[in-house]
Amino acid sequence: MKREEKKLVKNTLLLMLGNFSSKLLVFLMVPLYTSVLTTAEYATSDLLTTTINLLYPFATLMISTAVMRFCLDKCKDSRQLLSIGIWIEFIGIAFVALGSMLFFNSGNLQGYRYYFLIGFAGYSLYTLLMEYAKGSEKVGMYSIAGVCNTVALISCNIVFLLKLGLGIKGYLMAM
């Protein structure tokens, strides 16, 4: 095999490790969630998680994907790209924080606003840094970060849900 083909195979396997293993392990956590959380708590947590995933592309203008794409262009200053990406992410997080004052003001979601904001900010910055790692061709770092994130998520879920019995708040803190 040629050098480029070996690199492609290696990078593909590392990306698969970083993505697939994380998704599989989180999928295997579903029985824990359904046994510890009530139906209403699980529905609320799913609503918050889905809302984060839906808001992210609009609030951040998908800057993480742009950072990855332009990092791959060798003539660009990748640190400057990351800096711009972080600024745009913070602006998006600020808009989401303002909007959340209306959304979380009443109803069943009262009391979850700060969990939502921290979850959104964490997801946004994590996604940006992961895309930056991919764009900088640091595929090994990308995979290690994905696995570490999954291990931290599972560990926090076990501690917060099983050991401390924090229910939905424990689930959201682990998120």
Where are the model-predicted features located?
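Transmembrane-helix boundary and interhelical linker motifs in polytopic inner-membrane proteins
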Residues: 2-6, 34-41, 55-90, 134-140
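Small-residue-rich midsections of specific transmembrane alpha-helices
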Residues: 19, 24-29, 46-71
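Hydrophobic alpha-helical transmembrane segments
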Residues: 114, 144-175
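Alpha-helical transmembrane segments and their helix-entry boundary regions
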Residues: 15, 42-43, 81, 139-145, ...
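Interfacial/gating helices of multi-pass transporter permease domains
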Residues: 30-54, 168-171
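N-terminal membrane topogenesis motif
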Residues: 1-25, 76
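Residue-level recognition of pore/gate-forming positions within transmembrane alpha-helices
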Residues: 19, 23, 50-53, 89, ...
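Alpha-helical transmembrane segments of multi-pass membrane proteins
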Residues: 54, 58, 90, 94, ...
